[in-house]
Amino acid sequence: MSFNWTQLVPGVGHEYAHVATLGIATVAAVGIGAAARASLGKGEAAVLPASKFSLRGIFELLTEMTSGLADMVIGEHGKHYIPFFASVFFFILFNNLLGMIPGMTPATENMNTTFGFGVLMFLFYNFQGVKENGPVAYLKHFMGPVIFLAPLMFVIEIVSHIVRPFSLGLRLANVMMGDHTVLSVFLDLVPIGVPIPFYVMGLFVCFVQAFVFTLLSMVYVAFAIAHDH
């Protein structure tokens, strides 16, 4: 059972540590996002890219990455979803990075948190599918192209969609838990010097898991809004 500094707050304890950590990540994400927005300036300064390494430059780089990914996965409609998916990516990344602080555990290693993210994605892509195609046309996505196989395909598709929030949540929670466990073990054994490579690996894992979650969510949206021809 990993220690979390938030457990010292009265009423939090181990059971609600992930909720407290999620709250910290939310405040941090909003604060850093506001600082990055303020650094844009006004007029031409807001349009020109950052000329040096800065918080603004980091946000521009990651937003450009999200934009390119949306264009590649979703297509011409991808630009409409950039604000949403950029927010998802940054928020999950902030939650993951909190686990790199000694004495903190990321909210994303708790299945309750990651399943909540998965349910959000499930509701979002289905809503976009119905909005783009209409209820009847969207339901046809579940039936496949062969009429006599439609009942079987409908059941299979429904099950696969129901499983998606669990698969998204399990993947993120298990990987983050494993990474944090490895880092914690080496910090306990040799607290100086040796854990540095594991911190580097942890940073990579934090980024990759936020990227994978965002990528899979984009794929689900792309399939949901696709028009059958």
Curated annotation (Swiss-Prot):
GO biological process: proton motive force-driven plasma membrane ATP synthesis
Membrane topology field: Multi-pass membrane protein
Signal peptide residue numbers: none
Record-level Gene Ontology MF annotations: proton-transporting ATP synthase activity, rotational mechanism
Transmembrane parts of this sequence: 16-36, 81-101, 110-130, 142-162, 175-195, 196-216
NCBIfam families from the UniProt entry: ATP_synt_6_or_A
Name of protein: ATP synthase subunit a
Protein's organism: Bdellovibrio bacteriovorus (strain ATCC 15356 / DSM 50701 / NCIMB 9529 / HD100)
Organism placement in taxonomy: Bacteria, Pseudomonadati, Bdellovibrionota, Bdellovibrionia, Bdellovibrionales
